[in-house]
């Protein structure tokens, strides 16, 4: 089991779902500092309390942040290094969903400009701004093991004639990650991607707005050959990539859960 003792981490989208599971697991692995950012502060207190129960020695700092703002992302990362003196790893989990089954064929004609821009702005631009800011601060730190993990999706592998903005944003996230990985590896920074399959998070119902219940969504995906996984399973892969146990892996896009071939 990799230890994160004395290490500092930054997590976007860290207040719920996969991001929160990653924060909790980092604390269980004895991380010194977890700086999480999320567009909503609703879950900050409850997450801090749950982490304090599992590991009171882990410092958790919460920031309300919209990853669509490059300037605010830069300021957040710079403040982490200024306050805590280091940044060993980061996971960029922030993202938004797009509902399926809402558009008539040909679905491309109902993919409107506003939704396209909104989803790409968070799921792609947000990852770009965050990764760039993380590399910017990491490259000036003393030599050491540093790792960045971006979260894409099963949609990066599939070719569904719907939810164009979401699928495109996640495919682009995976491509961007691979390119950055090749660019910064020689600077001592490993960059990888995780592509979760169907995962039981608060965002799951947003992908299937016509479904009557969460169980109905799970049954539908199971019938298609896609069992529903849990956020903790994705978090274990993210934390492994953030740890020294995953050296020398870089530029990978790891599927977690069921995925099309």
Swiss-Prot record:
Signal peptide limits: 1-20
Active site location: 166, 170
UniProt-annotated glycosylation sites, renumbered to this chain: 43
GO molecular function, one term: oxidoreductase activity
Pathway per the UniProt entry: Alkaloid biosynthesis; ergot alkaloid biosynthesis
Function text: Chanoclavine-I dehydrogenase; part of the gene cluster that mediates the biosynthesis of fungal ergot alkaloid. DmaW catalyzes the first step of ergot alkaloid biosynthesis by condensing dimethylallyl diphosphate (DMAP) and tryptophan to form 4-dimethylallyl-L-tryptophan. The second step is catalyzed by the methyltransferase easF that methylates 4-dimethylallyl-L-tryptophan in the presence of S-adenosyl-L-methionine, resulting in the formation of 4-dimethylallyl-L-abrine.
Protein name (database record): Chanoclavine-I dehydrogenase easD
Species: Claviceps purpurea (Ergot fungus)
Encoding gene (name): easD
């Amino acid at each position: 089991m990799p230890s994160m003792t004395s290490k500092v981490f930054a997590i976007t989208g860290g207040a719920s779902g996969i991001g929160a599971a990653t924060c909790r697991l980092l604390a269980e692995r004895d991380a010194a500092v977890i700086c999480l950012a999320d567009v909503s502060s609703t879950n900050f207190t409850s997450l801090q309390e749950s982490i304090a129960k599992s590991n009171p020695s882990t410092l958790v700092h919460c920031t309300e942040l919209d990853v669509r703002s490059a300037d605010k992302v830069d300021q957040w990362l710079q403040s982490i290094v200024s306050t805590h003196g280091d940044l060993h790893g980061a996971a960029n989990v922030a993202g938004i969903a797009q509902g399926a089954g809402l558009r008539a064929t040909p679905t491309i004609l109902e993919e409107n400009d506003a939704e396209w821009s909104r989803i790409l702005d968070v799921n792609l631009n947000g990852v770009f701004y965050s990764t760039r800011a993380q590399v910017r601060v990491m490259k000036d730190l003393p030599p050491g093991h540093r790792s960045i993990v971006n979260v894409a999706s099963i949609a990066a592998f599939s070719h569904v004639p719907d939810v164009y903005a979401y699928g495109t944003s996640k495919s682009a996230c995976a491509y961007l990650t691979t390119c950055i990985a090749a660019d910064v590896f020689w600077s001592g920074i490993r960059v990888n991607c995780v592509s979760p399959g169907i995962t039981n998070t608060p965002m799951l119902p947003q992908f299937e707005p016509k479904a009557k219940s969460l169980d109905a969504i799970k049954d539908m995906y199971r019938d298609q050959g896609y069992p529903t996984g849990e956020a903790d399973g994705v978090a274990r892969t993210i934390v492994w990539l953030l740890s020294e146990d995953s050296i020398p892996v870089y530029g990978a896009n790891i599927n977690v859960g069921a995925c099309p071939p």
